[in-house]
Amino acid sequence: MNRSRTEIVAMILDAANGGTTKTKIMYNVMLTYNQLKNYLSILIENNSIEYFEGTKTFKTTEKGLNLLKIHNGMAELLHIIAND
């Protein structure tokens, strides 16, 4: 099953909710190191994820949580429409 970039971003934001390491995100979302590195770079640049140098962890920001909430709402709506 191919995932869209939007789905991958949502999975990363969900995995980083509460704070976690790059390795845990990589395994939870099933991405290669280079793929994850590219996504994290974009998400950090857009203030959707923040990186904590001291603990070497990533955490979804308030903006990222809002994006995730919108994504989940749209996915639910599309699922309802598809089942009508």
Where are these regions (language model features)?
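A short acidic, leucine-rich amphipathic alpha-helix
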Residues: 24-28
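Amphipathic alpha-helical dimerization/coiled-coil segments
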Residues: 73-84
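A short, conserved structural fragment
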Residues: 44-53
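Short amphipathic alpha-helical interaction segments
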Residues: 30-45
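Basic, amphipathic "hinge/linker" alpha-helix immediately C-terminal to the N-terminal HTH DNA-binding motif
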Residues: 56-71
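Short alpha-helical segments that sit at the start of domains
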Residues: 1-10
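Short capping segments at the starts of secondary-structure elements
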Residues: 15-21
